[in-house]
Amino acid sequence: MKLRVAVIYGGRTGEHEVSVRSAKSILAGLDCEKYETIEYFIDQNGKWSPGPILPEPGAHANIDVVFPVLHGTFGEDGTVQGLLELADLPYVGAGVLGSAVSMDKEMMKRVCKERMLPIVDYVTVTRQTPSIVDACRRLPFPMFVKPANLGSSVGISKAHDEQELEAAFSLAKQYDRKIIVERGIEGRELECSVLGNEAPMASLPCEILPSREFYDYEDKYLLDMARTQVPADLPGERTDEIRRLAVECYRAVECEGMARVDFFLEHGTNRLYINEINTIPGFTSISMYPKMWEHSGIPFCTLLDQLIEFALDRHRQKQVTRFAR
């Protein structure tokens, strides 16, 4: 009997179009001999089609497992994961805690710092911060200004001076009340995919070669000019270090299922820094998460099979857990 897989995509987020593209790739990649797919589309106003998944156990007997493909807020941040927990439905990817912590760049950095993982020096501000320049005095230029809870480089700017810092702050606070300002790292941009629950494994890393000053939304999805190298041209020891740190970061934030961990390798110092972790990475034709696994020996269809099995396995583990006396 075929497994019935519900794919949720779209959403109220600046990454709506990326979600749609990722979902199309996943729907095309799921083996029709193994799976029957059900599409749940969420428009940019939050309306579900054909209708919302309701938070009542047993209300969705036609669904065996859910594959959320919602990038960014209202989907990658624990909100949909909480809904699926209430509905007692197995789902692909991190749980509520791992999703929420990973989505919030400040919380992710706090957890990594507690685990003594290498992170870039940063300052946290809010929309109400009276002077962004004063708040960031201890950081040298250039700086990166980022909404704390968005992905796909939406709302991110690189500031080289105080005037650009003010403009970057004005842009970022349109997307989030909390903003992260980081010391700019001049170096290589590297990524590593992680897969698994209790015993996660890391792929071979890749390198992003932006066509612009940094790998922003336009470079990722619109210009189609950025180049990638899979696997990255790195010494074996550095590759091993990236894979180890990717798994350590994954475990630190209590991730499950899948994630992509992004790194900077700084010129001059040759130091490696964890940039961020993405719990629902892109699955578009240009997305690096599946590409890294393909180069590590796991083809796209097999990757989807494994993600679904991890989701079902986690749900089976919960069925033997007592939640009441």
From Swiss-Prot:
Binding-site positions, ATP: 136-191
Keywords, comma-separated and alphabetical:
ATP-binding, Cell shape, Cell wall biogenesis/degradation, Cytoplasm, Ligase, Magnesium, Manganese, Metal-binding, Nucleotide-binding, Peptidoglycan synthesis
Gene Ontology CC? cytosol
Q: Which reaction does it catalyse?
A: 2 D-alanine + ATP = D-alanyl-D-alanine + ADP + phosphate + H(+)
GO biological process per UniProt = cell wall organization; peptidoglycan biosynthetic process; regulation of cell shape
- EC number(s) recorded for this UniProt protein: 6.3.2.4
- What cofactors are annotated for this protein? Mg(2+); Mn(2+)
Say if the entry is tagged with keyword Phosphoprotein: no
Q: Which amino acids does the record list as binding Mg(2+) 2?
A: 276, 278
State where the protein is found.
Answer: Cytoplasm
- What Pfam families has UniProt attached to this entry? Dala_Dala_lig_C, Dala_Dala_lig_N
Per the entry, the cofactor note is: Binds 2 magnesium or manganese ions per subunit.
GO molecular-function term, one example from the UniProt record: metal ion binding
Residues of the ATP-grasp domain: 109-309
Please explain the role this protein plays, according to its UniProt record: Cell wall formation.
Extract the HAMAP family matched here: Dala_Dala_lig (MF_00047)
Kindly give the NCBIfam families that the UniProt entry links to this protein: D_ala_D_alaTIGR, PRK01372.1, PRK01966.1-4
Which family does the entry's similarity section mention?
Answer: Belongs to the D-alanine--D-alanine ligase family.
The protein here is known as D-alanine--D-alanine ligase
Q: Which organism is it from?
A: Solibacter usitatus (strain Ellin6076)
Primary gene name: ddl
